Amino acid sequence: MTNKTFFLAVLKEEAPRFKKAIEALPDDKHGYKVQERSRTAGNLAAQLAVQWKAISPIAISGSPKFDPHELDNLTKADMLAELDKGMTQLQADVESISDEEWETGQAGWGEAKNDTKYHMSWAFLFDAIHHRGQLITFIRAMGAKVPSIYGPSADDDK
C-alpha cells in the first residue's frame, strides 16, 4: 500500500467519525466554551466541517487555502453538508495526482515553507483529529452524549 492509498483509506475511515462528532453538538450550545480563552464548540465543529477544503489545494497546488471566516455562523446542517462536500472533493483531488507527486510534490504555508504534499496533508488530517478530540470533551461537559469514535462510549445505550 502506498502512502497516498493509506491516506485515502484513513480518510474514508475517519469521515464518519467526524460526522458523529458534529452530529453530537447540541443545536443550542454552539457558543459553549469550557474556558474564556477556549474556542467555542461551534467554531471547533465548523473547523471539522471545512478543514478538507484546506487540504484539497495542498494536493493540487501545494498550498492550503483556509478562510477562518467560513467558521462563523454555520448551522449543524451547513456543517454536515460542508463535511460531505469537502471529503468528496479531497478524495477526488488526492486520487487525481500521481503517487510520485504526492510523495515529492512541494508544499508550503506559514513556517512550513519547504514541505511535501503528503506530509502537509497528513499534518492537516492530524490537526482535525486533534480538534475533534477537543470538541468531544466539550460535548460531555455540555451534558450531551459522547458518540463512540474508536470504540464504545460511556454514553452508548443511555
Indicate residue ranges for each PLM-predicted region.
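Acidic/histidine-rich alpha-helical segments that form the ligand environment
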Residues: L74-G108, D115-F138
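Exposed loop/turn and edge beta-strand positions of beta-sandwich/beta-sheet ligand-binding modules
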Residues: M1, Q35, N73
